[in-house]
């Protein structure tokens, strides 16, 4: 299936080179992607009436469909209807929360090219309306996750735009962010960090 961005440029995930590292299968991980772990965490929060957080769907405009059989349809070409904002949003303790989840295989830094301008602008708007915006960053080689407030992401983005480094060092993430604990249920207990950072 061909998927295109709103500007017509073709989306080709397979063309992005990547090495598949040997994953540590720990009690908290067992080979799941960050998105799968967060989806499971959010399901736990919802089921236990802790928070209501959902993954935002990616809106697609289907352009070409083949019907190899009467009962089957195969989408051959589609476009992203609009640039996506962030991955997740919801409500916790009466506050709107909005966040992006990112993974990196880098050992010492997180590249800012993993963000897009419209995502940064979206996080600015959430903050301007007294919402809570943050990013969950996973260093896959260390199996470490950090919650970093959007104000820091915005500051690092601005630093990049004024000739500064094009990445956030792991040390900066450790200094400004909060290490997330992983377990069985919930998998990634980011609500505990929200309580400490935003509600204490």
Curated annotation (Swiss-Prot):
Keywords: Cytoplasm, DNA damage, DNA recombination, DNA repair, Endonuclease, Hydrolase, Magnesium, Metal-binding, Nuclease. Gene3D superfamilies: 3.40.1350.10. Its main location: cytoplasm. The keyword DNA repair applies. GO terms for cellular component: cytoplasm. The record marks 102 as: Transition state stabilizer. It is found in: Cytoplasm. It catalyses: Endonucleolytic cleavage at a junction such as a reciprocal single-stranded crossover between two homologous DNA duplexes (Holliday junction). The keyword Repeat does not apply. Binds 1 Mg(2+) ion per subunit. Endonuclease that resolves Holliday junction intermediates in genetic recombination. Cleaves mobile four-strand junctions by introducing symmetrical nicks in paired strands. Promotes annealing of linear ssDNA with homologous dsDNA. Required for DNA repair, homologous recombination and chromosome segregation. NCBIfam families: PRK02234.1-2 (NF002581), PRK02234.1-5 (NF002584), PRK02234.1-6 (NF002585), recU (TIGR00648). This is Holliday junction resolvase RecU. It comes from Bacillus cereus (strain AH187). The gene is recU.
């Amino acid at each position: 299936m061909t998927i295109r961005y709103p500007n017509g440029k073709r989306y080709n995930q397979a063309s992005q080179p990547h090495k598949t590292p040997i994953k540590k299968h720990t009690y908290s991980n067992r080979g799941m992607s960050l998105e799968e772990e967060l989806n499971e965490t959010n399901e736990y929060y919802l089921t236990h009436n802790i928070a209501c957080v959902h993954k935002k769907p990616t809106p697609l405009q289907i352009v070409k469909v083949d019907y190899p059989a009467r009962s089957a349809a195969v989408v051959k070409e589609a476009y992203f209807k609009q640039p996506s904002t962030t991955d997740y949003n919801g409500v916790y303790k009466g506050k709107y929360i909005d966040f992006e989840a990112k993974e990196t295989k880098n050992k010492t830094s997180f590249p800012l090219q993993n963000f897009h301008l419209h995502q940064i602008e979206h996080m600015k708007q959430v903050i301007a309306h007294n919402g809570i915006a943050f990013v969950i960053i996973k260093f896959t080689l260390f199996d470490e996750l950090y919650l970093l407030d959007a104000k820091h992401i915005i500051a690092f983005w601005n630093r990049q735009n004024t000739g500064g480094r094009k990445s956030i060092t792991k040390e900066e993430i450790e200094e400004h962010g909060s290490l997330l604990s992983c377990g069985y249920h919930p998998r990634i207990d980011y609500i505990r960090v929200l309580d400490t950072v935003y509600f204490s």
